[in-house]
């Protein structure tokens, strides 16, 4: 009876928990800070660079730990993309939807909370920031790139609104277009274009190959007979995950190649 019970319970569980993303298709995840409006109370407006740097570091950690091809962060959200190379390519948690959602949310929350005291005062460390997550497939690389276009355009729209609200009461900017809010900012002597790129458009994080010699600490940790012991100039190829400044991605004509294949951007500024 116990075997039958176990099988039946597993059947119930797997009916939903066993769902996987489709192989070969690009996979996306988006994480959002939960109730960050309350969490960020009393921080500098329209943005606090300390919080922005912590979000970028959290994004770097997620790209590093999950093997995602590219990451993107703006405000209190992070987007990740995986581009499978073959049918049996492994992505995070083998594409299991519920495990990806719970694992990514837990990883982001744990890193953010652990590093929070290094970036923000003690009063913020006593709060409990958390992230939620959703994952999905898109049919093509171009659509995967368009997800990031969507998020970058959202970042631009939100940054204009946040800048305007930092200088005007809500009623003065309610219902105004982006151009109208920028005009209001000009009246206060503020040029939205002068804000840093991470606030206006967000930040991309990519996995890039780099060839470099071992560092002193890496050399120390090598086995005694390793070739680099005799030749410290020996170059090693590694994968590094780091922020990368890109032109506005909506203007990049080969954006899928730039984001997922490491191509140099070709931008249309007409």
Predicted regions and their residues:
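Regulatory and interdomain segments flanking nucleotide-handling catalytic cores
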Residues: 1-270
